[in-house]
Amino acid sequence: DPIRDIEIINVELIMSDLEIIQNRIGKIAKKCESSKDKKDLFELETLRKCEEALLQNKSLRRVDLNEDELLLLKSFCLITLKPIIYMANVSEDDAIIGHNQYTDKVREYASNENSSVIVVSAKMESELAEMNDDDKKAFLEEIGISNSGLDKLIYATYDLLGLQTFFTSGKDECRAWTFRKGMKAPEWCAGIIHSDFQRGFIKAEVMSFEDLKEYGSELKVKEAGKMRLEGKDYLMQDGDIVYFRFNV
């Protein structure tokens, strides 16, 4: 019973969070009796809201918390507040289909907390790990699957954490860089590579991976007018290929 297994683990995590919350409540409640400070009162109210949910065996990610409450709770590193992905290990046949009666139950359970479920066959993944890229691609096409379970997990994890990728290319190497959605080109993305890029940012020369894939070369992308010059307010997009212009 996968739901039973999930709940056994969740109870342990809930008890861990409950201990942290109740220890803090014991301290802040005494302080609130004398100070009546608004920040302390807000903290106490938020912690008691969490305590009530945990006592009902409810993970904190299932509790409706606003931005201020989430910001306050961030410092406590509460496990059940963290986003989660459920991975269901199934047979090879069920992995090809994409579900079975048990994964359907897990998906229903996960939907109540806005979590996702990745269905994989550990046996199949082990076999794929031994293949080269061409053999792996041919095998997946033969069984009608676009991505391996491991690839699906990576994509889901990136999405869950709000991460995306941009690329840089030079004479010696091509590199992928991870950034958070909503980052601006000079503000953070250039700085990921080197602080000088951020400090002396002038412009970003940008083309998309999809355009490069379609036209076949950087020159043809430029000829098609798909290469762009972006300034300091440009929000980086997933799959951007970037040449940073800077001067320090």
Q: What is each of the regions a protein language model found here?
A:
Residues 1-14:
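Conserved P-loop NTPase nucleotide-binding/switch module
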